[in-house]
Amino acid sequence: MEELRKKKGFICDMDGVIYHGNRLLPGVKEFVEWLYREQKNFLFLTNSSERSPKELQQKLHRMGLDVDESHFYTSALATARFISSQAAGCSAYVIGGAGLIMALHDEGITMNDVDPDYVIIGEGNAYNYENILKAVRLVLKGAKLIGTNSDLTGPAEDGIIPACRAMIAPIEMATGQNAYFVGKPNPLMMRTGLRILGVHSEEAAMIGDRMDTDMVAGIESGLDTVLVLSGITSRSDIKKFPYRPRLVLDGVGDIPGVTE
């Protein structure tokens, strides 16, 4: 634990680590206070593409936690940055929330439902049969298929909801084209997170609640990994995977010793 506390940078997942639904998880406030007090570099990194950093900041504020907007990085931002680096000034047909559309717009990517360079799928309420059909036809005409993340499901207060991978699957199956996923566990998103923090992977830790995304992302990017049991994964689930986190904790409150 002392080795973890000496890390200069912390990349933290959000849902299941910081909050669940609209409820702040135990020990989180003390953990964030510790990050500030110890002058740690930290980033809340989420595979969700629906909300902007400003909206995430406001959500935490409503829960009584004040964190600067600069500490948030989403798969929408990662996707927009990736596409802009590949084809600056390109166009896209998008199925997703406002956070994704805003991120793409800020990178100079225009919306196009006739002959786009890319079809980009995120999460949101805009998903229906008509836009699936349009996406299929555009991909068959040559548009490249991008998913903001490869999560099959996401957490909800009353269970789970379909996430990006589940929503993009019909388009992949109908077109025979495999999507490229930008978010975790793609090391691309993690490397960008480390650059934002200004730390080397050996000086940072990845904290998350999912073995299939958070822990893989950390391991493949060279970070120490910390699995918290405050989210989707139970201790008995860990043995199902061929890899292990460096530490397993009940929650982030264990890191500064809140529960000790």
Predicted regions and their residues:
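Asp-based, Mg2+/Mn2+-dependent phosphohydrolase catalytic module
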Residues: M1-C12, V17-R37, R51-Y73, A80, ...
